[in-house]
Amino acid sequence: MIIDPERVAKIMRETAEIDVLPRFQKLSESEIMEKAPGDIVTVADYDAEKRLTAALKDLLPGADILAEEAASRDGLDLEDYQSARTTWLIDPVDGTRNFSKGEPTFAIVIALVKGGQT
């Protein structure tokens, strides 16, 4: 299994252009929610995660996906994926608090893990 990093980078760029950057410094209060006390999420997180999940499933069919917002909702964590299976790890907007405040310190983070190795 060889994944071209440029294909992953393209998916990340497209997601940033469509779901994240158009909302930067433009979020309304109703687009920022608290998923747990002190832990916020935005519509950009949800939309970006949905797009990234679909694109990465297409790129590597059969791989598991552990995405931050779905994992938070479903009560999953990395320990649930400690196996030889291939798993995409997704943080659709790493630095959500900064993003929600209009501070330019955030990123889309993706890792591919197989047998505990990235």
Regions found by a protein language model. Name each.
Residues 80-118:
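DPxDG-like acidic metal-binding loop motif
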